[in-house]
Amino acid sequence: MIALIQRVTRASVTVEDEVTGKIGPGLLVLLGVEKEDDEQKANRLCERVLGYRIFSDADGKMNLNVQQAGGSVLVVSQFTLAADTERGMRPSFSGGAAPDRAQALYEYFVERCRQQAINTQTGRFAADMQVELVNDGPVTFWLQV
């Protein structure tokens, strides 16, 4: 399971001209689900994402996680993160989980975030989405479990 996380001052996702998720300061999480992923990996990745200390403390040091910083989380499914890009000029998506399994794990990940008392907004699984964000820093990390 892969999460591309970006520290943002604001972010939103729109599906068919409807804003489905919108946050102020916090994390935009682009989430990719791979074939071998399961609930245990989703739990570990959620723990890492929410615990990752990439927000500044009073001394300006990256020392706070999203909850300590009072931030929110916007989770957007992105199957392209599971692409194999090592060869050729076209990505292969054979490493990605089947859509029904990927959706179940995506929803599980979102629910785990919400259980941690974090304001968690979402896109719409498998939809054509427009994601708008202001990357703060920029600060972007690739987390994989």
Swiss-Prot record:
- What species does this protein belong to? Salmonella typhimurium (strain LT2 / SGSC1412 / ATCC 700720)
Q: Which EC number(s) does UniProt give?
A: 3.1.1.96
Q: How does it assemble?
A: Homodimer.
Q: Which residue windows are coiled coil?
A: none
Q: What's the encoding gene here?
A: dtd
Catalytic activity from the UniProt record: glycyl-tRNA(Ala) + H2O = tRNA(Ala) + glycine + H(+); a D-aminoacyl-tRNA + H2O = a tRNA + a D-alpha-amino acid + H(+)
> So what does this one do?
An aminoacyl-tRNA editing enzyme that deacylates mischarged D-aminoacyl-tRNAs. Also deacylates mischarged glycyl-tRNA(Ala), protecting cells against glycine mischarging by AlaRS. Acts via tRNA-based rather than protein-based catalysis; rejects L-amino acids rather than detecting D-amino acids in the active site. By recycling D-aminoacyl-tRNA to D-amino acids and free tRNA molecules, this enzyme counteracts the toxicity associated with the formation of D-aminoacyl-tRNA entities in vivo and helps enforce protein L-homochirality.
Free-text comment about domains: A Gly-cisPro motif from one monomer fits into the active site of the other monomer to allow specific chiral rejection of L-amino acids.
Q: Where is this motif: Gly-cisPro motif, important for rejection of L-amino acids?
A: 137-138
Q: Write out the annotated subcellular location.
A: Cytoplasm
The organism's taxonomy opens as: Bacteria, Pseudomonadati, Pseudomonadota, Gammaproteobacteria, Enterobacterales
Q: What class of enzyme is it?
A: hydrolase
Q: What is its main location?
A: cytoplasm
What is the protein name stated in its UniProt record?
Answer: D-aminoacyl-tRNA deacylase
Question: What GO cellular-component annotations does this UniProt entry give?
Answer: cytoplasm
Q: Name one GO biological process term.
A: D-amino acid catabolic process
